[in-house]
From Swiss-Prot:
UniProt keywords, alphabetically: Isoprene biosynthesis, Manganese, Metal-binding, NADP, Oxidoreductase
Keyword Membrane part of the UniProt annotation: no
Organism per entry: Methylococcus capsulatus (strain ATCC 33009 / NCIMB 11132 / Bath)
Functional note: Catalyzes the NADPH-dependent rearrangement and reduction of 1-deoxy-D-xylulose-5-phosphate (DXP) to 2-C-methyl-D-erythritol 4-phosphate (MEP).
Record GO terms (molecular function): 1-deoxy-D-xylulose-5-phosphate reductoisomerase activity; manganese ion binding; NADPH binding
The name this protein goes by in its record: 1-deoxy-D-xylulose 5-phosphate reductoisomerase
Classification via InterPro entries: DXP_reductoisomerase, DXP_reductoisomerase_C, DXP_reductoisomerase_N, DXPR_C, DXPR_C_sf, NAD(P)-bd_dom_sf
Family according to the record: Belongs to the DXR family.
Catalytic activity as recorded in UniProt: 2-C-methyl-D-erythritol 4-phosphate + NADP(+) = 1-deoxy-D-xylulose 5-phosphate + NADPH + H(+)
PANTHER family referenced in this protein's UniProt entry, alphabetically: 1-DEOXY-D-XYLULOSE 5-PHOSPHATE REDUCTOISOMERASE (PTHR30525), 1-DEOXY-D-XYLULOSE 5-PHOSPHATE REDUCTOISOMERASE, CHLOROPLASTIC (PTHR30525:SF0)
Length: 394
């Protein structure tokens, strides 16, 4: 039986992971859970799964959880507090696998800690890899950690790739990687109407159930841009070899086009429990709880090229991965700051790419050869982005 730590257990991916794990109590034991501050949900998860540790970033929330666990007779669960607690539980000796499901840059250090400790890293936090790039991959190679992608697109590519893909996509006969995108809720919205889009409209994804931040990223297609960067790193591919294809039905989750004309596609219902179960069981398979795909109900599949005028964030992501170094970290920090402002109604939806473009022009990228360089670029960009947003409101 394997021990698992779930970073971000109260979020969408964390909840889905626990749903899958509950179906296979003979395969995994939950060693540690973590949350930012959702004490109510974390308490219920602790009561259901009885982890040894529960880590909470906010100290006051940790104190509240500790009191509730004691009152419920669950005082044996050790409650840890602070960002460093996440790194601690991610590298515990009794943990074999780490589900890295914290959204945004906050997940970087604990995910990196899991990689350094040689764990099986089930990577749902794309920002950690986008920010640290080759530095993260070097730690994976050094420690012998196994990196298993959870994003539906990268998990699909992983399933369609030959085992030797780390030698380089071209070296194993891959012509290109085709990442599918739903196009989000505004694929056909008149451009003039995007200026007045509300947070409620932006988070209403047509196919997937996701958190608020990633739903906005899907609406701007920054989510797909981050996935392009992630695909280059995971599969040792060049940016020109990763193509985005708008596929409205979200039935094909991605494809791999080989030099002999073969195209392999991974298909399934849009349910994150499928890639989660694949990574948890790999190299085996087990039941996920998701419905099987009914091809007769699907009936047709449509594909189109993304409109970069409608989705400038996708263009900016390609520019960042082409620039290299800390440019992807700058892109990510600017996007996170802009999305937070949009969700807080302090920035228009169309202001998100403007903030990112401003930051990429103002913050010079450096070599991403140390974690300190990455964190410095992240911090500097957030300041530049926030000032730009504040100036827009004056």
């Amino acid at each position: 039986m394997k021990g698992i730590c779930i970073l971000g257990s109260t979020g969408s991916i964390g909840v889905s992971t626990l749903d899958v794990l509950a179906r296979h109590p003979d395969r995994y034991r939950v060693v540690a859970l973590s949350a930012n501050g959702n004490v109510d949900r974390l308490f219920e998860q602790c009561r259901a799964h009885r982890p040894r540790y529960a880590a909470v970033i906010r100290a006051e929330a940790a104190a509240c959880l500790r009191e509730r666990l004691m009152a419920a007779g669950l005082g044996g669960i050790e409650v840890l507090a602070g960002p460093e607690a996440l790194e601690q539980i991610a590298s515990l000796p009794e943990v074999d696998s780490v589900m890295a499901a914290i959204v945004g840059a906050a997940g970087l250090l604990p995910t990196l800690a899991a990689a350094r400790a040689g764990k099986d890293v089930l990577l749902a936090n794309k920002e950690a890899l986008v920010m640290s790039g080759p530095l993260f991959m070097a730690e994976v190679a050094r420690s012998g950690a196994r990196l298993l992608p959870i994003d539906s697109e990268h998990n699909a590519v992983f399933q369609c790739m030959p085992a030797a893909y780390r030698a380089g996509s071209r070296a194993v006969g891959v012509r290109r990687i085709l990442l599918t995108a739903s196009g989000g809720p505004f694929l056909h919205t008149p451009l003039a109407e995007l200026e007045t889009v509300t947070p409620e409209q932006a988070v209403a994804h047509p196919n997937w159930v996701m958190g608020r931040k990633i739903s906005v990223d899907s609406a701007t297609m920054m989510n797909k841009g981050l996935e392009v960067i992630e695909a280059c790193l995971l599969f040792n591919a060049k940016p020109d070899d990763v193509q985005v294809v708008v596929h409205r039905q979200s039935v094909i989750h991605s494809m791999v086009d080989y030099v002999d004309g073969t195209v392999l596609a991974q298909m399934g219902t849009p349910d994150m429990r499928i890639p989660i179960a694949h990574a948890l069981a790999w190299p085996d398979r087990f039941e996920s709880g998701a419905e099987s795909l009914d091809l007769f109900a699907v009936r047709q599949l449509n594909f189109e090229r993304p409109d970069l005028a409608r989705f400038p964030c996708l263009r900016l992501a390609y520019e960042a991965v082409g620039a290299g170094g800390t440019a992807p970290a700058i892109l990510n920090a600017a996007n996170e700051t802009a999305v937070a402002a949009f969700l807080d109604r302090r920035l228009a939806f169309t202001g998100i790419p403007r903030v990112i473009e401003h930051c990429m022009a103002r913050v010079a990228p450096n070599a991403a050869d140390a974690i300190e360089s990455v964190l410095q670029a992240d911090a500097e960009t957030r300041k530049v982005a926030q000032k730009y947003i504040d100036d827009l409101r004056v």
